[in-house]
Structure formats: C-alpha cells, structure tokens
Swiss-Prot record:
Residue numbers annotated as active site: H9 (proton acceptor)
A molecular-function term among this protein's GO annotations: sirohydrochlorin cobaltochelatase activity
Catalyzed reaction equations: Co-sirohydrochlorin + 2 H(+) = sirohydrochlorin + Co(2+); Ni-sirohydrochlorin + 2 H(+) = sirohydrochlorin + Ni(2+)
Binding site for Co(2+): H9, H75
Residues binding Ni(2+), per UniProt: H9, H75
Protein name: Sirohydrochlorin cobaltochelatase
Function of the molecule: Catalyzes the insertion of Co(2+) into sirohydrochlorin as part of the anaerobic pathway to cobalamin biosynthesis. Involved in the biosynthesis of the unique nickel-containing tetrapyrrole coenzyme F430, the prosthetic group of methyl-coenzyme M reductase (MCR), which plays a key role in methanogenesis and anaerobic methane oxidation. Catalyzes the insertion of Ni(2+) into sirohydrochlorin to yield Ni-sirohydrochlorin.
Keywords in alphabetical order: Cobalamin biosynthesis, Cobalt, Lyase, Metal-binding, Methanogenesis, Nickel
Single GO biological process annotation from the record: methanogenesis
NCBIfam families for the chain: F430_CfbA, PRK00923.1
Length: 143
C-alpha cells in the first residue's frame, strides 16, 4: 500500500495552501493511493514531518513524497530531504541562500516505519505548457 504526501512551500496567503490542497484532492480522485496528505515547508500547517507521520498512520509500506515545485532548488535538494531523513543533495557549504527568507523551520528528520520515496518536482512538461497557454488566453480575454 502506498500513501502520497504533497509538499508545498507555504505562504501567509491562504490561497497558496488551498492550491496545494486542491491538487491533493485531484491526486486522490485520479490515483489509487491509500491516502494523500499535504505538508508545507514553512508558514503553514501541517509541516512536512506531520504530513508524513499522518500518512504512515494509515499502515502503508511506502510513502511517496512529491514536492509541488516547478524546479529543483535549495528546498527540494536540501531542506525537504533533511526533513525526510534522507541524504541532502545540496552541500551546506554551497549555500548562498542566506539572503533569502528564513523562517523557523524544523529540520528534525521524521521517523516512520514506512519506506519514504522522494519524487522529482514537476519539471518541464508539455502539460504545464498547456496550462501556461490557458493562462495567456485568459489574460487576453480569449477563454
């Protein structure tokens, strides 16, 4: 049995959270997973670790964690892997991210019985280009 955890960045704006939650609803409807949870890097609850723990409570063997980010960055290469207890692909010595916003993030690795499988971010995909074209048409009033 497989559970899914979608990871959003988190924001003070409620819309950001609602978007990730709506994507989770679609994944739950379209996929065949035991449960689909949502966790956030910062500024929103639940945390990534809380979402993974909740997913594990459903008794699954594997939890697939999917960053709902377009591309890799410090969060997907370093921060999320740390939270999952996985080896980060980003060396802290390479970190020029200090100028960026730093909120009080908990990097304590989550401890669950299930195997954690870490997926790639969304990436360049023709389906995303279709959405971009839809947004262009909407902006031009050509819906």
């Amino acid at each position: 049995m497989v559970a899914v955890v979608l990871v959003g960045h988190g924001s003070r704006l409620p819309y950001s959270r609602q978007v990730v939650e709506k994507i989770a609803e679609y994944v739950e409807e379209m996929g065949d997973f035991e449960t689909v949870e949502v966790g956030f890097m910062e500024l929103c609850e639940p945390t990534v670790q809380e979402a993974v723990k909740k997913a594990a409570e459903s008794g699954v063997d594997k939890i697939v964690v999917v960053p709902v980010f377009l591309a890799h960055g410090v969060h997907t290469k370093r921060d999320i892997p740390k939270m999952l207890g996985l080896e980060p692909e980003w060396d802290d010595d390479e970190d020029d991210h200090d100028h960026h916003h730093h909120h009080h993030r908990d990097y304590t690795p989550v401890d669950v019985d299930a195997e954690i499988v870490y997926a790639e971010p969304l990436g360049a995909d023709p389906r995303i280009a279709e959405i971009v074209i839809d947004r262009i048409k909407e902006a031009l009033g050509e819906e």
